[in-house]
Curated annotation (Swiss-Prot):
HAMAP family: Ribosome_mat_RimM. Transmembrane segments: none annotated. One of its GO terms (cellular component) is ribosome. Residues 97-169 form the PRC barrel domain. Gene3D superfamilies: PRC-barrel domain, RimM. This is Ribosome maturation factor RimM. One of its GO terms (molecular function) is ribosome binding. Belongs to the RimM family. Binds ribosomal protein uS19. It is found in: Cytoplasm. An accessory protein needed during the final step in the assembly of 30S ribosomal subunit, possibly for assembly of the head region. Essential for efficient processing of 16S rRNA. May be needed both before and after RbfA during the maturation of 16S rRNA. It has affinity for free ribosomal 30S subunits but not for 70S ribosomes. SUPFAM superfamilies: PRC-barrel domain, Translation proteins.
Length: 174
């Protein structure tokens, strides 16, 4: 499974740098000189092309990245909208208990401790107050806080996430 770690926003300057919106918790690990990244055009869904990073510098909340073979503004601008992706198999295993990568939770069936089917985790949202699971259900979408008091168990093998929702939480999607 491919995971997006960055998106090319635009070209920067005339020497071929690109502005990259960071979409990873580990930008220092992913965007380092000498590292190879695969860039895919978001609209054509092809296999993409590999690039070697020649240089990286911070630019506010974004990065300015120089890629081998991208030496002018026109070439850099041609990458606008491209997504930098990695294979989920390349991620290190998580050592901490009850900690998951977003892609591991997305697609899990959600049910209550009473056995009621709720829906499927569509997305993990990261907010200032913590993580929320966007659960797609028949009546729409319900946001479930990803906290131990509500999420009682996660079984990646069985693809099931069990919750003990407080009264009214599941009514919000109706």
């Amino acid at each position: 499974m491919e995971l997006v770690i960055g998106r090319v926003v635009k070209a920067h300057g005339i020497t071929g740098e690109v502005v990259v919106e960071i979409r990873t918790d580990e930008p220092d690990r992913r965007f380092t000189p000498g590292a190879s990244l695969r860039a895919k055009r978001s609209r054509d869904g092809g296999t993409g092309r590999n690039y070697v990073i020649e240089g990286v510098r911070e630019h506010g909340a974004r990065l300015l990245v120089r890629l081998a073979g991208v030496n002018d503004r026109d070439t850099a601008d041609g990458l606008r909208g491209s997504l930098f992706v990695i294979d989920s198999a390349d991620l290190p295993p998580i050592e901490e208990p009850d900690t998951y990568y977003d892609h591991q939770l997305e697609g899990l069936r959600v049910r209550t401790t009473a056995g009621q089917d709720v829906g499927v985790v569509a997305e993990v949202l990261h907010t200032g107050a913590g993580e929320l699971l966007a659960v797609k259900c028949d009546s729409g979408e319900v946001l479930v806080p990803f906290v131990g008091a509500i999420v009682t168990s996660v079984s990646l093998d069985d693809r099931i996430l069990e919750i003990d929702p407080p009264d009214g939480l599941l009514d919000l999607g109706s």
